């Protein structure tokens, strides 16, 4: 049976969402909130927007409020990740970027200014991206020893220079 033009036009991301029933739900907490958006159909994350103006001095940090609440799909958490343009152009990074499945507060983004100049955040600026990732909730088991591996306890550059 041939595909209709409408069915063929459905994006891969919409098909994937329809198949797993996943939905990232959100609530605007104020008139200052901007709905999360994706920059393209295949973008991994949803852009998060500042609800207010902030000034972040060099080598300082700020919790930038979005004035949105979110509910990530069941079995997921939200990872708040940096936007590459802010990192490259302004030395802005994101910290403490985990939103648990059961968190329902105002989403705040910790922005670090590693630059030498103050950084101005304006209301409506894209400040970070929210990526929904699957998570496992394993039971915690204390044991006497762990199995040996080829790598062993080597870390911090032990597997090679590059």
From Swiss-Prot:
GO terms for molecular function: dUTP diphosphatase activity; magnesium ion binding. Phosphorylated in vivo on Ser-11, a reaction that can be catalyzed in vitro by CDC2. Its cofactor is Mg(2+). The modification Phosphoserine is found at residue 11. Its main location: nucleus. This is Deoxyuridine 5'-triphosphate nucleotidohydrolase. GO terms for cellular component: mitochondrion; nucleoplasm; nucleus. Pfam families: dUTPase.
């Amino acid at each position: 049976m041939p595909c209709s033009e409408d069915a063929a036009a459905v994006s891969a991301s919409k098909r994937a969402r329809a198949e797993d029933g996943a939905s990232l739900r959100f609530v605007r907490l104020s008139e200052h909130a901007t709905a999360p958006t994706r920059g393209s159909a295949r973008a991994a994350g949803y852009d998060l927007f500042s609800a207010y103006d902030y000034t972040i001095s060099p080598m300082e940090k700020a919790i930038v409020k979005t004035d949105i609440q979110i509910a990530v799909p069941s079995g997921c958490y939200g990872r708040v990740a940096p936007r590459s343009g802010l990192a490259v152009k302004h030395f802005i990074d994101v910290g403490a970027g985990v939103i648990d499945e059961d968190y329902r507060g105002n989403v705040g983004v910790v922005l670090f200014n590693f630059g030498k100049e103050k950084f101005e955040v304006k209301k409506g600026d894209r400040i970070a991206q929210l990526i929904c990732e699957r998570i496992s909730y394993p039971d915690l088991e204390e044991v006497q020893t762990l199995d040996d591996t080829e790598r062993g306890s080597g870390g911090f550059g032990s597997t090679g220079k590059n």
